[in-house]
Amino acid sequence: MVAAGVNFGLDLVEEIAELKRERNAVILAHNYQVPELQDIADYVGDSLGLSYQAAQTDADVILFCGVHFMAETAKILNPTKKVLLPDLDAGCSLSESCPPEKLKAFLDAHAEKNYYVIAYINCSAGVKALSDVICTSGNAEKIVRSAPADRNILFVPDQNLGAWVMERTGRKMDLWQGNCYIHVEFTARSINRIRETYPNAPVVAHPECTYAVRLLADEVCSTEKMVTFCRNSPAREIIVVTEAGMLHRLKKEVPGKLFIPGPTENCFCGECRFMKMNTLEKAHAALLNMSPEIVLPEALRKRAEAPILRMLELSKS
């Protein structure tokens, strides 16, 4: 066992496996994580799948390879467990677009609307605590359809996901003006350009993309549903319009097909700088030192837990 620091001659993967056994830890990784972290994870998935795994685990320690709000969600669902995040600075532009104090001020200023607040899971614990129910891209349509018919809906923080759900359900909602900086970099022009190179390849896009990009897609869905779409599609080449880390999972689970990363106007490198802050070395250090740890005040955790549990219950029905 290494006492401190990182021995660069050491096999980090084996060392992480040993630490995981010693700590009775589970490793959860989002689809957008670097390949090395996806490969050592016990479960790789989207926000909904990771929420289920976090809620069900019997491990004492959760090493969450994702961004801050995801690790917070794991802690909200597991108050007695130690939740580690390899890099505590792994934030999210979408989450940061909706600070809880701004949402609280907005709700107070529009109290007459009596909003039913549906929050995309890509938000802070503070925003979750102000919400009636949480959703993910995988269940957003179902959650919106279940909302009380006599209430005005405020959907936060992603305006593109919210607009897509309105298109799917016909339910009018007021949308918070937030977005994912990666998904809005994909444009109609950049997607049309790649289609000229691969004219027979269907396009699958994430609903966080803009309306213009969604219009060009053959399928718009969550990252988890992208796996199913790509597996079932007869196409041998598929253009994937989401964060580039998703391609690693697709190549592993759907071998024999060519997955083309959707380009932005600038490059073929649609990588989230926050997701890529986590590394194998940082994961090793987190398990070795049992930090950085996610800590939440209990009162905040309990308020944030209720809308998450409501989502998990509605998702089952």
Please name every model-derived segment.
Residues 1-240, 247-261, 265-317:
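Active-site loop-to-helix "anion-binding N-cap" substructures in soluble metabolic enzymes
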